[in-house]
Amino acid sequence: MTRDELCQAAVAMLDRAYIPYSHFPVGAALECADGTVFTGCNIENAAYGCTICAERTAIFKAVSEGHRDFVRIVIAGKSEDYCVPCGSCRQVMMEFAPEMEVICLNGQGQAKSFRLRELPPYGFDQSWL
């Protein structure tokens, strides 16, 4: 799959997000080493600790299907800023693919690419919501 196709797959997931509380949709598309792609969206719950991010949705789908070698993930949002993964998602990604490429999209479709290990300075906080 091309980078553009992977980006389109992540953007397509924005409409599937279940976000009645934050109104902050996120979509993700995860590419495995064998070319298989798993997508995900964020899914919120009134018990906020039960909420799951788009990135972890895609990763957990992949792992549950026997995939553990990840090449890259695209994370899409609708805000002006690039949609970067939260700390929990970064930790889960580090468990499986510390050198994975992370492509962050903003609402205008612009992309910024990082290696997972490069992300820690770019935090996610309440100002994003």
Feature names for model-found ranges:
Residues 2-16, 67-129:
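C-terminal binding/interaction regions
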Residues 19-22:
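Short loop/turn motifs at secondary-structure junctions and domain boundaries
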Residues 25-32:
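Short beta-strand scaffold segments in enzyme catalytic cores
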Residues 42-57:
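Compact, glycine-rich, soluble single-domain proteins
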Residues 54-74:
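Short, solvent-exposed cationic patches
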